[in-house]
């Protein structure tokens, strides 16, 4: 993950040729398609409660190198008096604030109160940090697969919606659709920022994009999504909004696209869905965008796609 945020050139070599956006058949999604836009929002509003969250160790429990500045600070705070004698008894050149306190002649009850208070402050600070951090980041999610049964089921209302295909290989490298595109890394652990906070900002090893690793890390449970994200971090946007997309290279209709409309009993609701479907087909025809329809594979647990002409799509709508 660190390489992905540190060296964008290396990431470009990993980019898939196409990415896919799964949509339910509703007015908002169809307008996005026809206006060539997509909605970018904070991870706070996504369907994963852990989305974008990070952790860092309690600073009082983080190992720090014993430097003259550290000793001076501890002495000024009145924590160290006989600093030379105390430091000579330390087993290594690194220690934590807690370890220093434990070596002092301090009442055990006072020490426990200090530790408990510091943990409470740390938990509150971590919560506030995550909240404020995620408020300033805006993302849009995609998949590198169109053939996932679960993606069609979860994000297109049981295969009744559609999927937009974008050809990334033809996008300008400076365009946000490619420049800000990152793969999601699936892991057992939440991203830990501690080691990066300790790095010297003046060193060649420092990169303020390290924190993006929190936004591209998700639990292993989500790995079926094969997700890629366009990420606009830290003030590049002033709020949730629609942003432009490239021209779609293809639009895939769900395997249940036409039948789901046919089964609607309320005539007014049915007519609304027919009009939305008609809008998709007309847009693809006008823009010369390939129209496909998904179908179940007969050999594997995945979706395949077949070409469908505009005329055939219009005919299927008329027959509903």
Go through each PLM region and give its residues:
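Partner-binding and oligomerization surfaces adjacent to conserved cores of proteins
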Residues: 1-320
């Amino acid at each position: 993950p660190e390489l992905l945020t540190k060296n964008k050139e290396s990431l470009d070599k990993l980019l898939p040729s196409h990415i896919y956006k799964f949509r339910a058949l509703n007015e908002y999604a169809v307008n996005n398609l026809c206006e060539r836009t997509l909605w970018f929002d904070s991870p706070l509003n996504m369907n994963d409660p852990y989305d974008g969250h990070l952790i860092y160790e309690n600073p009082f429990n983080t190992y720090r190198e014993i430097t003259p500045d550290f000793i001076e600070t501890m002495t000024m705070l009145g924590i160290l008096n006989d600093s030379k004698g105390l430091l000579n008894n330390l087993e290594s050149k690194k220690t934590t604030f807690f370890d220093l306190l434990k070596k002092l002649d301090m009442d055990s009850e006072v020490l426990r109160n200090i530790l408990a208070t510091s943990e409470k402050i740390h938990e509150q600070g971590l919560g506030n940090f995550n909240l404020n951090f995620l408020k300033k980041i805006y993302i849009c999610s995609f998949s590198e697969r169109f053939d996932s049964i679960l993606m069609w089921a979860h994000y297109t209302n049981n295969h009744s919606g559609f999927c937009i295909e974008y050809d990334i290989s033809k996008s300008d490298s400076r365009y946000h659709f490619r420049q800000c595109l990152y793969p999601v890394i699936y892991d057992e652990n939440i991203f830990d920022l501690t080691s990066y906070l300790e790095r010297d900002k003046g060193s060649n090893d420092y990169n303020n994009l390290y924190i993006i690793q929190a936004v591209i890390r998700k639990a292993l449970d989500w790995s079926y999504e094969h997700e890629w994200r366009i990420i606009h971090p830290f003030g590049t946007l002033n709020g949730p909004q629609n942003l432009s997309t490239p021209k779609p290279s293809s639009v895939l209709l769900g395997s249940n696209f036409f039948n789901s409309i046919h089964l609607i009993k309320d005539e007014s609701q049915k007519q609304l869905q027919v009009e939305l479907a008609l809008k998709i087909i007309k847009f693809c025809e006008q823009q010369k965008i390939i129209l496909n329809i998904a179908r179940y594979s007969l050999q594997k647990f995945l979706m395949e796609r077949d070409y469908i002409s505009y005329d055939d799509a219009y005919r299927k709508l008329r027959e509903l």
